[in-house]
C-alpha cells in the first residue's frame, strides 16, 4: 500500500446521482495523469446506498455514505475531514474534466501568494461550446449585485486567467 501524501484530494458529493457520478469519475480517470490524487465521493443520504455501488464499480475511490443528507457544504466538509492531499479540489458530481486542466490550475494557484483558490473555465454540459463561468465581477456598491463573466457566450479561448472575487461552487480548487 502507498502511504505517500497525494498531491490532490478530489471531493465530490453524490445525492441520487449515480450515473452522473460515474460519468464524472470516468472523465477524471480518462484525463488526469500528471498528479497523484485520492478521490473521495460522499454519498449524501441517497435513497439507495450508492456509496457501495460506486466503491464496487471504482475500487480506486473512497466512497463514504452519510445516512442523512448533510447539504452541499456538509457533504463537502465530510470529505474535507477525510482528505489527505496537499490541495483540495471540490467538484460537483455532474462535471466532466478536460485534459491538462489540473496542471494548469496548480500552476496558476502557485503563481502568486495572493491567490487563495482557483476555479477553471466551466462550459455548459448541454452546449459544450457555451461558457457557464469564466469568473465573476466585483459586487456593485450601488446594487450589491455582480455578474458571471462570459455566461452563455461561445468559448473561443478568449477568456484568459483573471482575478475573480468568487470561485464557482461547481469546481473550487
Q: Predicted segment positions?
A:
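Cell-envelope/extracellular polymer assembly enzymes that use nucleotide-activated donors
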Residues: 7-9, 38
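A conserved acidic beta->alpha catalytic loop
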Residues: 18, 27, 43-52, 68
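Short, acidic, metal-binding catalytic loop of nucleotide-sugar glycosyltransferases
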Residues: 26-36
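Short beta-strand/loop segment that forms part of the nucleotide-sugar
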Residues: 36-45, 64-66
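Glycine-rich, basic loop-to-helix element that forms the pyrophosphate-binding segment
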Residues: 65-83, 93
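Short aromatic/hydrophobic "clamp" motif used to bind/position activated sugar donors
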Residues: 88
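Conserved donor NDP-sugar-binding/catalytic core segment of glycosyltransferases
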Residues: 96-133, 139-141
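A recurrent flexible, glycine/aromatic-enriched loop bordering the glycosyltransferase active site
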Residues: 153-173
Amino acid at each position: 500500500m502507498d502511504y505517500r501524501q497525494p498531491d490532490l484530494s478530489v471531493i465530490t458529493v453524490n445525492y441520487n446521482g449515480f450515473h452522473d457520478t460515474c460519468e464524472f469519475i470516468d472523465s477524471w480517470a480518462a484525463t488526469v495523469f500528471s498528479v497523484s490524487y485520492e478521490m473521495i465521493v460522499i454519498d449524501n443520504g441517497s435513497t439507495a446506498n450508492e456509496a457501495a455501488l460506486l466503491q464496487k464499480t471504482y475500487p480506486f475511490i473512497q466512497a463514504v455514505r452519510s445516512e442523512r443528507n448533510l447539504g452541499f457544504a456538509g457533504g463537502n466538509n465530510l470529505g474535507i475531514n477525510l482528505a489527505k492531499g496537499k490541495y483540495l479540489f471540490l467538484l460537483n458530481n455532474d462535471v466532466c474534466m478536460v485534459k491538462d486542466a489540473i496542471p494548469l490550475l496548480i500552476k496558476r494557484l502557485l503563481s502568486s501568494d495572493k491567490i487563495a483558490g482557483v476555479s477553471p473555465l466551466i462550459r455548459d454540459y448541454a452546449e459544450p461550446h457555451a461558457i457557464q463561468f469564466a469568473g465573476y465581477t466585483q459586487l456593485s456598491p450601488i446594487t450589491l449585485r455582480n455578474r458571471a463573466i462570459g455566461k452563455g457566450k461561445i468559448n473561443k479561448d478568449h477568456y484568459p486567467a483573471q482575478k475573480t472575487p468568487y470561485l464557482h461552487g461547481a469546481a473550487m480548487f
